[in-house]
Swiss-Prot record:
This is LIM homeobox transcription factor 1-alpha. It is found in: Nucleus. The keyword Nucleus applies. It comes from Mus musculus (Mouse). The gene is Lmx1a. Residues 256-269 have a biased composition (Low complexity).
Amino acid sequence: MLDGLKMEENFQSAIETSASFSSLLGRAVSPKSVCEGCQRVISDRFLLRLNDSFWHEQCVQCASCKEPLETTCFYRDKKLYCKYHYEKLFAVKCGGCFEAIAPNEFVMRAQKSVYHLSCFCCCVCERQLQKGDEFVLKEGQLLCKGDYEKERELLSLVSPAASDSGKSDDEESLCKSAHGAGKGASEDGKDHKRPKRPRTILTTQQRRAFKASFEVSSKPCRKVRETLAAETGLSVRVVQVWFQNQRAKMKKLARRQQQQQQDQQNTQRLTSAQTNGSGNAGMEGIMNPYTTLPTPQQLLAIEQSVYNSDPFRQGLTPPQMPGDHMHPYGAEPLFHDLDSDDTSLSNLGDCFLATSEAGPLQSRVGNPIDHLYSMQNSYFTS
């Protein structure tokens, strides 16, 4: 019985000792702890804690080189890195050599770009720019004031249609700065001091190397240009001018293609508008013959303005005829009396047209008052 009690006491003391030892080394693993690296439940007795997250011991390694991290580490985007790869991936890079800049290095700034002191130099003459020097940052490349002015002068002399002429590929790949300078000196006879630069003709191998590099990047860095110059045996300036001319050529082709697309769209719009206009013109041509005739009211108004239908209002004495004392100014009794005479007015019906048959042209045949006067004169003279 005493032996059993002693064994139980020893077991409890061993448990307390192990608990105190685990509290010194690390935290006991709870069944709900999940590793931040592999997203699995941690079943180990001990774990590592980084930035309020739990990790397996074997998961604490660099995400780039897979080396285990023992003393220090860098944490970014839920990943761990060693010092070397963290500085290589996320440190500020030089705008010239694209290498990482150490925190203890001196730098030169140009707008948003940062450069090493040795990399802060002109890309043409490779002269290191000092504090206070004037320079130009063009397409991510540094140019001193003198080289920038020379480049502007050379580019202004380049003919814009030189790349689109019907020449061979070798002639199109000439160094256009030299060609433009020679052309400008020949056209301007007054400027005899400007020397003609030699024309550089590229071989097929050189042109292929340039085009392959242009497909990778249209704006290569200084190291790539120096490598191409060493491979092709040309100067860095020739390589730089070729890339500038090639970029200008691609932009011009893109603008020309866009202009052609706009012209096609405008042509289609004009064609559709002309088609619709011809359809409307056909309908107007069909309706025009019927719309040109004047209306009956217009015909009557014209005839009434020519002939005066009421002569008795002008102060004339009305003619005296048998039976006119009943209707001195009326026309209907006069017509009835005249129609009763078959000898002298037998052709009176031939002089008038029926209103229903003549229509608006009745007023053009003659005024009934005029016919009445003519028949009256013939009646009294007979």
